[in-house]
Design a protein with these regions (language model features):
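Nucleotidyltransferase catalytic core that binds NTPs
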Residues: 3-111
Length: 111
């Protein structure tokens, strides 16, 4: 068993028996999304019930050259299902994503 499961997820589930689902969130700017990001997403998807990438719609070149739609297109070409890419005002706070789940029975793990 890996450290994420052993040190984070397992204790959450043991301390909170009402938790039925663990959602992994990989947030970032992803300007651009590269193979190392994809590898991290695939790893996360194997550890949790549902895995998502959260990113913003900020486009301010040169540091932020891609908007959300462009990022989704790029990530999808690399193999991330488009329904697993969520737009957030801040990619490190999955507010929109959290609305899709029951807060009493879902735990969120951010990587």
């Amino acid at each position: 068993m890996n450290r994420l499961v052993e040190e984070i997820i397992k204790p959450i589930l043991e301390a909170n028996p009402q938790i039925k689902k663990v959602v992994g969130v990989y947030g970032g700017r992803f300007q651009p999304f590269g193979p190392h990001h994809y590898k991290t997403y695939k790893w996360l998807a194997k550890q949790v019930d549902d895995a998502y990438i959260t990113t913003s719609n900020i486009k301010k070149p040169p540091r932020h050259p891609m908007n959300f739609k462009e990022k989704v297109r790029h990530m999808s070409k690399m193999g991330v299902p488009s329904n697993r890419i969520i737009e957030e005002k801040s990619p490190y706070k999955a507010v929109n994503l959290a609305k899709k789940y029951d807060s009493d029975t879902t735990a969120f793990v951010y990587v």
